[in-house]
Amino acid sequence: ISFDPNIRPNLWASRDEICETLQRFLTVTDIALPSYEDESIHWGDSSPNDTLNRFAREGVAEIVVKNGSGAVVAMAGGKIIIRPTPVVLGVCDTSGAGDAFNAGYLASRLLGYNQEQSIVRGQKLGGEVIRHFGARLSKEIFSKGPFKSFT
């Protein structure tokens, strides 16, 4: 089971409800894809490493902490990876960046790529999405270049 908390406070009755529910979800999560920004706001994590460690303590086997333009911090099989996020030129709209990253990462894992390779592919897809308006790429763009291998 993969899980991106993607916390939206206005959908919950209280912060306590958010934290209690998400903590229960982690007990059945195999792959977690949290955003450090969300986690720092709701859990008080002071760094992406804090987020990674908190998810690991809950028993999540594979964790990828997204951090906007900051480095991705990840862990699987006890191995920690810190992967800088490439600079993206021509950013138009950051909507969907995290979802695109997740799609690229999970598709790559399913295709047999290791965790670091999957992070790179997720970063590429997320980076391309933010160069266009809207939260997803058109079929024409997606079916060309480095994204062809996702289809």
Q: What is each model feature region?
A:
Residues 1-54, 69-72:
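Conserved beta-alpha-beta core of the PfkB/ribokinase-like small-molecule kinase fold
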Residues 44-151:
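Conserved phosphate-binding/catalytic region of the ribokinase-like
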